[in-house]
């Protein structure tokens, strides 16, 4: 299994629509202003979050249960930024839509710009033949409110190509998060 380079990522995006929309370069500025970078990097792709957020709230004072998750635990927020309260979290989705090849697995890691501010981005691996928008989780580990910027870089996807094709892909298993279109809450 080997990590894939910028050249491979560009080729897969062009020939197989692996990432849409796709940015072949690293974008660091918009309208002359510095932003959190996104686009193709040396050995990965820096993804952006859209302007659709689900902000966790404790208004209902319920127990957080992944098997019986109460969707009322979130408030929908749409905008260029999302302010996450102290010691809380928010969900978002990527701007980019992914189509992962059958012989590829990805790992997604938060960008250091956010990590150095106490904001942790968590995403599980994109499995072989998974397709959809990625649901992102932002945890604010600080005692202060934290700001997330929509349409800027939030995490880096690293692509690994296997030496052999898996017997059963995410698509073959009818994975519950296949083809997700928006911010997707826990499913059992």
Curated annotation (Swiss-Prot):
The protein's name in its UniProt record: dCTP deaminase
Family label: Belongs to the dCTP deaminase family.
Gene Ontology MF terms in the entry: dCTP deaminase activity; nucleotide binding
Biochemical pathway: Pyrimidine metabolism; dUMP biosynthesis; dUMP from dCTP (dUTP route): step 1/2
Annotated catalytic residues: 137 (proton donor/acceptor)
Origin: domain of life: Bacteria
Coiled coil: none
Enzyme class of the recorded protein, top EC level: hydrolase
Gene3D superfamilies noted in UniProt: 2.70.40.10
